Swiss-Prot record:
The keyword Ion transport applies. The chain crosses the membrane at residues 7-27, 114-134, 154-174, 189-209. It comes from Acorus calamus var. americanus (American sweet flag). This is Potassium/proton antiporter CemA. PANTHER family: CHLOROPLAST ENVELOPE MEMBRANE PROTEIN, CHLOROPLAST ENVELOPE MEMBRANE PROTEIN-RELATED.
Amino acid sequence: MPKKKGFTPLPYLASIVFLPWWVSLSFNKSLEPWVTNWWNTRQSETFLNDIQERNVLERFIELEELFLLDEMLKENPETRMKNLRIGIHNETIQLVKTDNEYHLHTILHFSTNIICFAILSVYSILGNEELVILNSWVQEFLYNLSDTIKAFSILLVTDLWIGFHSPHGWELMIGSVYNDFGLAHNEQIISGLVSTFPVILDTIVKYWIFHYLNRVSPSLVVIYHSMND
């Protein structure tokens, strides 16, 4: 395949990886004051789903019980109720501030995710020729590797993503995606995804090895199975 004159894959690949992150970070910093001002001046209603509302209520009850216990241990009963009301009021304000920060974090991260997706979409449309050339560079690089290195790389990647220790990594990654999109942490859903994704990927990898590698490079499959055993 003819390569574009003067095209080098590494700078282009670096731009694909780092430019969306840099632009989204810049937008995040520039949008933060505006979003904060809009939320504080025009937001008259708090939007909470059932899980978030239950978490906020549980945190408030826990703080109220701890503060009440602290006041009961004090020796002066005359100022106990006054301090209790003041303390609960202050804790309520703190919970509201924490909730506002959570919603601002959700809005900003959701906006930056959309910006990253838009930038990558523009890259795929306008830089289609560069992507084709980059793909040819990658294929040429992989073709020049020995079968042993290829088998070792496949085994390493599959063990990282679908191996015995992969569920913890999947849990962290899915939790990070949940936080980025402002979704409430739900152990049941995350556990279901963690137990499902590795199985699906394992099936896809086995099908790819059986259907593609057996036809293209039987020796690579033999080396892979020898390492895996």
